[in-house]
């Protein structure tokens, strides 16, 4: 196997490879760009026009997606997978990965779309670097297809284990065909966002014109302890994408895929913020109308008003000014293109 196929080992060890470019027997080029960043270029005759960005490890303790990308990259380096797409593999937060922690100083996935310019420290610099790597990878060739999957696992359990967040940007419409692709990859639900965000996938969607998704793939566990996380469908789908073997129906069906829309975000304004939910509550737990969800300074209260409301990403420990939870409601998909 080519040494650059061991990107995860290099990243965890903090080593820079001596050889920055290597070729597989079938002519696929592997090029080391930066710590945790490797570009794959297929032979020109096999290039199908897809630019695929696969990122994981934005949170260093979310290991199942990291291990998935490691398996895919090793398959390419062993000449077992034969790419027809350009691919950028990114391990988002190498230092947090080495420590086995979600982040070192602050959450990188709250530092995109310019937010890193308002901050300092290791993660702010890394967020800027990731934006640059993504922008350079996608480049100025608008004739190619751009797709970004940012792979995560959650800090809590979920009633729907594998789900996606689809970013929003003014003037763009969510794609039914992309949702069909996710459904075939084992994704059970998609949250259709309705405002801009400061996450990595929101940056690539809004600023770089990619179809982009944050994929939540189960619960965060340590390296080597992901036997209960079944990513077989996603791994098969990514292999097909990489090799250009994907089959997409002419009339996309979303049968079995649950769609949700954001109703409200719960913003933590002060240290007095209280979230009235059990510490072990699962994502997608339903909340009844009238439920007092949270309280903050100046008599701020969040009371559930929506029918069939569910909560995702409840986290009272976020910094002041950040989102401490999202109330979502079912969506009929009428706005899809």
Curated annotation (Swiss-Prot):
Residues annotated to bind Zn(2+): 59, 62, 152
Active-site residue list: 216
Names of required cofactors: Zn(2+)
Q: What is its EC number?
A: 3.5.1.96
Q: Which biological process terms from the Gene Ontology are attached to this UniProt entry?
A: arginine catabolic process to glutamate; arginine catabolic process to succinate
Name the Gene3D superfamilies for this protein: Zn peptidases
Q: What is this protein called?
A: Succinylglutamate desuccinylase
Q: What does this protein do?
A: Transforms N(2)-succinylglutamate into succinate and glutamate.
- Catalytic activity, reaction form: N-succinyl-L-glutamate + H2O = L-glutamate + succinate
The entry's free-text remark on the cofactor is:
Binds 1 zinc ion per subunit.
């Amino acid at each position: 196997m080519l040494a650059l196929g061991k990107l995860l080992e290099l990243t965890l060890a903090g080593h820079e490879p001596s050889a920055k470019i290597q070729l597989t027997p079938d002519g696929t080029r592997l090029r080391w760009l930066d710590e945790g960043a490797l570009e794959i270029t297929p032979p020109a005759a096999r290039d199908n026009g897809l630019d695929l960005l696969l990122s994981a490890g934005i949170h260093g303790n979310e290991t199942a997606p990291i291990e998935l990308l490691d398996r895919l990259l090793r398959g390419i380096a062993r000449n077992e997978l034969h790419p027809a797409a350009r691919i950028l593999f990114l391990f988002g937060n190498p230092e947090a990965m080495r420590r086995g922690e979600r982040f070192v100083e602050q959450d990188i996935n709250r530092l995109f779309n310019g937010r890193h310019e308002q901050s300092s420290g290791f993660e702010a610099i890394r967020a800027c670097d990731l934006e640059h790597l993504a922008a350079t990878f996608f480049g100025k060739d608008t004739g190619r297809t751009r797709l970004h999957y940012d792979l995560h696992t959650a800090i809590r359990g979920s009633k729907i284990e594998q789900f996606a967040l689809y970013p929003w940007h003014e003037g763009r419409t969510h794609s039914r065909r992309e949702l069909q692709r996710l459904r075939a990859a084992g994704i059970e639900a998609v949250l259709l966002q309705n405002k801009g965000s400061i996450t990595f996938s929101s940056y690539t969607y809004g600023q770089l014109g990619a179809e982009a998704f944050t994929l939540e793939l189960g619960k965060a566990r340590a390296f080597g302890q992901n036997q209960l996380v079944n990513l077989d469908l996603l791994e098969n789908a990514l292999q097909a994408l990489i090799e250009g073997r994907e089959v997409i129906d002419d009339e996309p069906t979303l049968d079995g895929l649950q769609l949700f829309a954001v109703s409200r975000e719960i913003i933590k304004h002060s240290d007095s913020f209280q979230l009235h939910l059990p510490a072990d509550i699962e994502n997608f737990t339903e909340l009844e109308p009238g439920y007092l969800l949270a309280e903050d300074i100046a008599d701020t209260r969040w009371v559930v008003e929506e029918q069939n409301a569910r909560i995702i990403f409840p986290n009272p420990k976020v910094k002041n000014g950040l989102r401490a939870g999202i109330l979502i409601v079912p969506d009929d998909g009428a706005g899809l293109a």
